[in-house]
Structures are given as structure tokens and as C-alpha cells.
């Protein structure tokens, strides 16, 4: 029986943090043994906003190394760099030509980011969701792990596939593109900022104390957790909308300590912040230590790391080219012999 296919990825710019790991990568690790898993370093997305060209390649390698250090197995999944598979850019262009402009202008993330960019906002930022659609549709993905903030982008990919490609160039019996479904994983899916329990932990937050990166040393982790925003109440609990920081930090502890939500809630029900924060810091340091150790090993052997990426690229290109050929034929292009 063919395994359901999953596609996901993370931008290489900025250090990966607890939110990336607990909300995404940890779930990919669980999926890879039961799903045909494609994981890419989405460097083409990274250049839709100003970036440092002298750091992009190194950050791409670093991100791939962290995927592996977190438990992704190149024998069970395909790990590759997005820009090294040219079909992403070509399919994006083909999808651009059938996607209405107003579909992109209503994207919430574009509205938010374009305000920050002002007059410097790029066409690439507007077109980001179409490139994301190309990423997904290229691999005939059955499922796409998404958080709440990415659901709108996946819905766009589904609409492009159904309404703009399959309905116009295919048939119900013979669709051109597979329409993917969302895979929304609840626990740990949304890790919030250490400085604001109502905002998602983010690489782009100018306050570095708002996030714990996967490569932070123990003393910095302890410092960030010590300074994390709290409230004046004694005892930690889940589900109180007036205590978002308690919910967030207790949720992180439940996962990183391995205790689970029920046991963590019981343990910390009457605990003060002064007692809880060192516990959380110790659990975080212990959880990240093996990842950091493996990462250093991988970055010390660039030849092996690049071999893994080449292997993943070869697999990805085979799948992507087959999809791209179907789309070219459906749109009526002259196919090279």
C-alpha cells in the first residue's frame, strides 16, 4: 500500500526556535516512518524580504543540519533545498498565470508584512502564497502539516488546484493536480512568545528574549526563561484565557519534561513562578542538549551533509518533474522530445 505523502519546510533565515521544533519538526519526525515525507529548506521564500546573501547558503546548511539533529532520517524522508529543484520556480510561474490577483491581495500575512515593508514591499512577498502552493502541489502531497496561521495559504493552494487548474485543464476523472488536505496537530502546535503569551514565538521578533533557539547555550536559556513574562498568581494552569503566559510555559514544560499535560498540570498546580522557572530551564536544556551535540557533529562533516541534501534533491526532482510535465501538457505547451 502506498504511504500518504506529506510536504513541509521552514525558512533558513534566522535561528530555528522551540516553536519550529515543537510545532513542526517534532511532528515531521513522528510522521516519517508512516508517511512518504518530503521536507525542504525553503530558501526561495526567504528572499521575499530583505536578506543577507553572504549568510543564506550557510543558513540553509544549518537548517538542514537541525532537521537531521532533531531526528529526521534521510533513509525515511527526502530532505532538500528548495532552490536546487528548479521545478518550484517554473510551477510557480504557471500557477501565477491562472491565479487572480485579488486572491493574493486578501491574504492576511501579506497585509501584515506589507505594512512593515512600506514602499519596499516586493512582488515576491505578494506572490509568496503561490510559491507555497507550487511547493505543495509539485509533490502530489496528500497532507500538509499546518498551523492556524498557515491555513489560509493551504486553502489558496487547494483553490488554485481545484478551480484554476483541474476545473479548466483537467477533468473529475483525470485531475491534473492532487488537492491536499491539512494536517493540523494540536499539542505543541502553537508555541507562544516568552515576552507575550498572546503572540506566536517568531524568528522575526526584534526582541531576542522572546524566543529560545535550538542552539542557545544553557546559560542563555536559563536567562531567557528567568526573564519570561509571567503574572502575579500562584500556581500554573491550562486553559485560563486571562493567563496566556501560564498556559504557554506550562505547555512547553509538559512536552520538554516528557510528563505530559495532565501530570505537568498536577505537579505545578500550586507552584510559584520562582520554583517553576528553574524546572522549565532544566527541562529545556536537557531536551536541547542531544540536538545541539548532533548538530555540531553534522556541521563538522559538510561532505556528508551535502550528500544527504543531494540524495534528497534527486528524489524530489524525480517527483517534481513528473508533476510539472503533467501541468505543461495540460496547459498545452509543446513538449520537448
Swiss-Prot record:
GO terms for molecular function: ATP binding; tryptophan-tRNA ligase activity. It catalyses: tRNA(Trp) + L-tryptophan + ATP = L-tryptophyl-tRNA(Trp) + AMP + diphosphate + H(+). It is found in: Cytoplasm. It is an enzyme of class 6 (ligase). L-tryptophan binds at residue 135. GO terms for biological process: tryptophanyl-tRNA aminoacylation. It holds the Pfam family tRNA-synt_1b. Keywords: Aminoacyl-tRNA synthetase, ATP-binding, Cytoplasm, Ligase, Nucleotide-binding, Protein biosynthesis. CDD domains: TrpRS_core. The keyword Transit peptide does not apply. Gene3D superfamilies: HUPs, Tyrosyl-Transfer RNA Synthetase. A motif ('HIGH' region) lies at residues 12-20. A motif ('KMSKS' region) lies at residues 200-204. GO terms for cellular component: cytoplasm. ATP binds at residues 11-13, 19-20, 147-149, 191, 200-204. Its EC number is 6.1.1.2. Its main location: cytoplasm. It comes from the Bacteria. InterPro entries: aa-tRNA-synth_Ic (IPR002305), Rossmann-like_a/b/a_fold (IPR014729), Trp-tRNA-ligase (IPR002306), Trp-tRNA-ligase_bac-type (IPR024109), Trp-tRNA_synthetase (IPR050203). Catalyzes the attachment of tryptophan to tRNA(Trp). Homodimer. Belongs to the class-I aminoacyl-tRNA synthetase family. NCBIfam families: trpS. This is Tryptophan--tRNA ligase. It comes from Prochlorococcus marinus (strain MIT 9313).
Amino acid at each position: 500500500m502506498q504511504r500518504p505523502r506529506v510536504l513541509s519546510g521552514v525558512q533558513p533565515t534566522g535561528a530555528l526556535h522551540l516553536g519550529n521544533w515543537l510545532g513542526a519538526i517534532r511532528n515531521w519526525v513522528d510522521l516519517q516512518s508512516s508517511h512518504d515525507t518530503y521536507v525542504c529548506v525553503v530558501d526561495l521564500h526567504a528572499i521575499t524580504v530583505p536578506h543577507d546573501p553572504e549568510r543564506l547558503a550557510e543558513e540553509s546548511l544549518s537548517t538542514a543540519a537541525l532537521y537531521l539533529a532533531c531526528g529526521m532520517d534521510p533513509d525515511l524522508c527526502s530532505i532538500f533545498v528548495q532552490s536546487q529543484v528548479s521545478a518550484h520556480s517554473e510551477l510557480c510561474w504557471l500557477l501565477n498565470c491562472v491565479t487572480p490577483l485579488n486572491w493574493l491581495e486578501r491574504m492576511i500575512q501579506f497585509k501584515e508584512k506589507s505594512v512593515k515593508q512600506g514602499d519596499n514591499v516586493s512582488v515576491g512577498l505578494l506572490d509568496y502564497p503561490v510559491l507555497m502552493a507550487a511547493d505543495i502541489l509539485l509533490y502530489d502531497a496528500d497532507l500538509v502539516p499546518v498551523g492556524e496561521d498557515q491555513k489560509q495559504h493551504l486553502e489558496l493552494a487547494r483553490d488554485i488546484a481545484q478551480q484554476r487548474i483541474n476545473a479548466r485543464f483537467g477533468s473529475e476523472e483525470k485531475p491534473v493536480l492532487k488537492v491536499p488536505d491539512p494536517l493540523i496537530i494540536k499539542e505543541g502546535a502553537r508555541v507562544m512568545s516568552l515576552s507575550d503569551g498572546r503572540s506566536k514565538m517568531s524568528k522575526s521578533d526584534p526582541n531576542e528574549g522572546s524566543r529560545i533557539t535550538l542552539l542557545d547555550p544553557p546559560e542563555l536559556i536559563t536567562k531567557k526563561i528567568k526573564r519570561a513574562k509571567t503574572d502575579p498568581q500562584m500556581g500554573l494552569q491550562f486553559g485560563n484565557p486571562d493567563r496566556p503566559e501560564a498556559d504557554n510555559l506550562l505547555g512547553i514544560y509538559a512536552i520538554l519534561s516528557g510528563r505530559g499535560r495532565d501530570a505537568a498540570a498536577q505537579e505545578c498546580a500550586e507552584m510559584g513562578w520562582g520554583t517553576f522557572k528553574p524546572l522549565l530551564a532544566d527541562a529545556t536544556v536537557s531536551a536541547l542538549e542531544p540536538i545541539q551535540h548532533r548538530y555540531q557533529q553534522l556541521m563538522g562533516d559538510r561532505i556528508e551533509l551535502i550528500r544527504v541534501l543531494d540524495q534528497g534533491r534527486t528524489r524530489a526532482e524525480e517527483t517534481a518533474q513528473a508533476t510539472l510535465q503533467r501541468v505543461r501538457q495540460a496547459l498545452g505547451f509543446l513538449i520537448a522530445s
